[in-house]
């Protein structure tokens, strides 16, 4: 993978950690994210229409598939943040997606993964696990697995699968349509799928707009711009590699926790970050 692609993924990953922090601070997490997606789709409209193309039946199938899993992702992530802490949910959601996407990439997309690339993906997964530890002692080694018993962790894990699923559809989609036009269609369809929740929770919608309108708009811009960067990378790179490198957002999340939320920068967080960086280097050389 080229340095330009890795740099774009780094920027997208940083933006991803920023909007997750803003989403965690919101009131109704699911409504907040749906409103952000709606605003993002509206902002993208003129740019997408300028790149409009004829849409084949295959492209529509891919768009619908992506929209379904993207809708599920926002619902699951919002549900997870409503039940658990950012420090638990974010690493689990981002850390599980590389595992799923490698399986999907190899067995469904028929991507060939070199031994160095596979080792890099494995390092990223291990690094995210280490970063998730509270301390280096036997009592804490199984803590990340024990946490899977909670509903919040289960939602986070499912959101990781949703990321892998829509990433697989998107890998195909950007080969069929212009990335901007494709993303607008998938995003717009996601809004339609999620619209019933907005209608059913009108009071929550009004309250969220009243209390968090600036954050909603900020997240809308960040989600839209950040994922467009990823789609451009997917045009010329393996989905398994691109999605795995996006796991660096967990490192950015830990750094934000230390700087913004004044969380302690523990040895596991430092070592986990270094392991993730080593994994990214391996993928870059693959």
Q: What spans do the regions from the language model cover?
A:
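Small-residue-rich packing faces within the transmembrane alpha-helices of Major Facilitator Superfamily
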Residues: 38-42, 125, 191-192, 252, ...
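Specific alpha-helical transmembrane segments that line the substrate/conduction pathway
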Residues: 69-70, 82-129, 183-191, 239-259
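Hydrophobic/small/kink-forming positions within alpha-helical transmembrane segments
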Residues: 13-17, 45, 67, 71-75, ...
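Membrane-interface interhelical linkers
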Residues: 1-68, 74-86, 133-155, 188-224, ...
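Residue-level recognition of transmembrane alpha-helices
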Residues: 36-37, 93-94, 117, 177, ...
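Juxtamembrane helix-loop boundary signature in multi-pass membrane transporters
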Residues: 1-7, 99-161, 268-286
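Selected transmembrane alpha-helices and immediately adjacent juxtamembrane segments
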Residues: 148-181
């Amino acid at each position: 993978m080229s340095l330009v692609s890795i740099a774009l993924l780094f920027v997208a990953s940083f933006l991803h950690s920023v909007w997750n922090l803003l989403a965690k601070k919101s009131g109704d997490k699911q409504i907040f994210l749906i409103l952000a997606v709606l605003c993002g789709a509206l902002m993208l409209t003129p740019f997408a229409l300028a790149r409009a193309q004829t849409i084949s039946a295959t492209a529509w199938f891919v768009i619908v598939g992506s929209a379904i899993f993207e809708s599920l992702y926002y619902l699951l992530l919002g549900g997870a943040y409503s039940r658990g802490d950012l420090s638990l949910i974010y690493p689990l959601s981002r850390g599980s997606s590389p595992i799923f996407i490698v399986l999907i990439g190899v067995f469904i997309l028929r991507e060939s993964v070199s031994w160095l690339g596979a080792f890099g993906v494995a390092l990223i997964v291990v690094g995210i696990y280490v970063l998730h530890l509270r301390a280096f002692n036997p009592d804490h080694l199984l803590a990340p697995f024990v946490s899977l018993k909670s509903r919040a962790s289960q939602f986070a894990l499912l959101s990781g699968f949703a990321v892998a699923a829509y990433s697989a559809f998107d890998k195909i989609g950007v080969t069929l349509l212009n990335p901007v036009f494709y993303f607008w269609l998938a995003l717009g369809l996601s809004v339609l799928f999620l619209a019933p929740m907005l209608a059913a929770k009108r009071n929550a919608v009004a309250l969220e707009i009243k209390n968090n309108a600036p954050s909603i708009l900020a997240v809308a811009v960040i989600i839209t711009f950040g994922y467009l960067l990823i789609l451009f990378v997917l045009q010329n790179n393996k989905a398994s590699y691109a999605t795995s490198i996006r796991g660096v957002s967990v490192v950015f999340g830990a750094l934000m926790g230390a700087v913004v939320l004044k969380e302690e920068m523990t040895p596991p967080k430092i070592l986990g970050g270094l392991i993730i960086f080593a994994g990214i280097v391996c993928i870059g050389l693959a």
